[in-house]
């Protein structure tokens, strides 16, 4: 079972599988929005550097050529999530003999589990009138899970003051408390200064999103939970982010698919805050179908589906 992507760095693994003629399952359940056609209002000339172009060329073009000319063995099974799984460049590794198993993202497993359990005491004690900010690794951890091998453009001394002003605006205009859903890899204390002494909860992201009135996001795929629970989402960007191709691309890809325009936290004038609470239900359903779960796949746990399909 391979949950790694094919690229220049992982080529040797696929080459070894081919040499030893090993049967394998290739996973593409967590495809994220990144289509160029989904992006609007981005100044590509400003942010698309030679380094970014070189990275795209090496991972996609050279990777494809290596697979083609060196005859990399195709997987016996492809584990697919949303309908966009087969549109991913990684899907070019399959052939006509590959059996496609339609399932869903790992987030949907967590969604199924969460719907079966009762609120814990902490969640039960939190008042419903709150917005939840989905924390990300950077800038405290100098990388971002969605941009592997690339340093985050954010610096704590610039990002956090602007973020807190953003939270202040939301709390004042929408009469709502902002609380923090800590990233699993973070080490925040409760009510840290850099979050404006706001409450922080760890390992409770889905619980908080399920109960909140509004989700605040940068480029986290945890918006899957917001989509599944039909929660309004505010996306944000910043001056530092706007000069970084990968992060800008991810934020706008997600936002545009839900008919949202990211708010620049360094320019908070002339914002219709009440409009931020609106959602387009058709786009939410489409997002779920394309990136979370094939509408025809079963509402079963991912590996239960896989085991049954392989055994049939």
Residue ranges and their predicted role:
Residues 1-3, 77, 130, 177, ...:
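Structural motif
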Residues 1-114, 222-223:
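Active-site and donor-binding regions of nucleotide-sugar-utilizing enzymes
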Residues 9-13, 34-36, 85-89, 141, ...:
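Short, charged/polar "capping" segments at the starts of alpha-helices
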Residues 102-108, 112-113, 164, 176-229, ...:
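Donor nucleotide-activated moiety binding/catalytic core segment of transferases
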Residues 110-189:
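Conserved catalytic-core segment of nucleotide-activated headgroup transferases in glycan assembly
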Residues 192-195, 221-296:
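Catalytic binding pocket for nucleotide-activated donors in carbohydrate/polymer assembly enzymes
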Residues 286, 290-312:
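C-terminal alpha-helical cap of glycosyltransferases
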């Amino acid at each position: 079972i391979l949950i790694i992507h094919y690229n220049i760095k992982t080529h040797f693994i696929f080459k070894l599988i081919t040499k030893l003629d090993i049967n394998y399952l290739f996973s593409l359940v967590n495809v994220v929005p990144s289509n160029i056609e989904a992006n609007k209002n981005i100044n590509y000339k400003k942010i698309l550097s030679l380094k970014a172009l070189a990275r795209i060329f090496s991972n996609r073009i050279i990777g494809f050529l290596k697979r083609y000319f060196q005859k990399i063995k195709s997987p016996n099974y492809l584990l697919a999530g949303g309908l966009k799984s087969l549109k991913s460049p990684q899907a070019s590794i399959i052939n006509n003999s590959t059996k496609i198993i339609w399932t869903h993202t790992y987030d949907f497993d967590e969604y199924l589990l969460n719907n079966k359990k009762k609120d814990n005491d902490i969640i039960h004690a939190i008042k419903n009138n709150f917005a939840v900010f989905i924390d990300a690794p950077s800038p405290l951890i100098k990388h971002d899970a969605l941009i592997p091998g690339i340093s985050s453009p954010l610096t704590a001394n610039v990002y956090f003051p602007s973020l807190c002003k953003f939270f202040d605006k939301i709390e004042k205009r929408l009469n709502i408390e902002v609380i923090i859903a800590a990233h699993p890899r973070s080490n925040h204390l409760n009510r840290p200064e850099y979050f404006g002494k706001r409450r922080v909860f760890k390992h409770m992201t889905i619980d908080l999103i399920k109960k909140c009135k509004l989700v605040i996001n940068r480029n986290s795929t945890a918006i899957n939970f917001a989509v599944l629970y039909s929660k309004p989402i505010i996306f944000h960007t910043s001056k530092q982010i706007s000069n970084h191709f990968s992060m800008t691309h991810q934020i706008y890809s997600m936002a545009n698919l839900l008919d949202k325009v990211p708010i620049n936290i360094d320019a908070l004038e002339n914002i219709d805050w009440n409009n931020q609470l609106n959602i387009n239900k058709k786009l939410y359903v489409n997002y779920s179908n394309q990136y979370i779960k094939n509408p025809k796949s079963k509402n079963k746990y991912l590996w239960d589906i896989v085991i049954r399909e392989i055994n049939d």
